[in-house]
């Protein structure tokens, strides 16, 4: 499984919204400018995140997006699966030896567990720690 810019930028969007909880709606333009990313590309990613209930859109002159939940409960796995699809390391395992199938399954489960056990709040702690050093 290769996490593409979809997953990486999806995490960027949601982390920025998590950082700014309480600041009101945040525009994609401000995230794009702050992170030097394409606003147009972020617009393509926000729809699936909104449809999945991870973010919420606020209309109006001062509209934008807010995180639709507690950063302690939204996981990296939620975001990656929404934008990338299921976590698959090997396309087909039927033709593999039992030992190889076991390896691929353990690897997939390890990746899945890390993504599902890492919340936005966890990632925010790491970003704050790295900004302090």
What name fits each language-model region?
Residues 71-96:
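Conserved segment of winged-helix/HTH DNA-binding domains
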Residues 45:
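Residues within the DNA-recognition helix of helix-turn-helix
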Residues 3-7, 11-37, 66:
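N-terminal helix-turn-helix DNA-binding core of bacterial DNA-binding proteins
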Residues 54-67:
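Beta-hairpin "wing" of winged helix-turn-helix
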Residues 92-133:
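C-terminal regulatory/oligomerization modules of transcriptional regulators
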Residues 33, 50-51:
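Alpha-helical residues within the helix-turn-helix
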Residues 40:
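Key DNA-contact positions within bacterial/archaeal DNA-binding proteins
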